[in-house]
Amino acid sequence: MTDQIRTLQGRVVSDKMEKSMVVAIERVVKHPIYGKFIRRTTKLHVHDENNECGIGDVVEIRECRPLSKTKSWTLVRVVEKAIL
């Protein structure tokens, strides 16, 4: 049996913490009654060892063991840097 490590892509919404950031993961779900597609957002705390990300960057993250009370994801790579 193989365990696949979950990886997601999202946008950095906060990088004010030391070695940490908040990433917003956006998904589209269908409303159960009306059938309209709605955007839903989940915010995750992510470990950024080298402080290489800034607000607006698109990043790839993967799940890991719990690093703190709220942080159990780590940065894999920066997919796209934000244009400021």
Curated annotation (Swiss-Prot):
One of its GO terms (molecular function) is structural constituent of ribosome. The keyword Ribonucleoprotein applies. Disulfide bonds: none annotated. The keyword Ribonucleoprotein applies. GO terms for biological process: translation. Keywords: Ribonucleoprotein, Ribosomal protein, RNA-binding, rRNA-binding. One of the primary rRNA binding proteins, it binds specifically to the 5'-end of 16S ribosomal RNA. Part of the 30S ribosomal subunit. Belongs to the universal ribosomal protein uS17 family. This is Small ribosomal subunit protein uS17. It comes from Yersinia pestis. The lineage of its organism: Bacteria, Pseudomonadati, Pseudomonadota, Gammaproteobacteria, Enterobacterales.
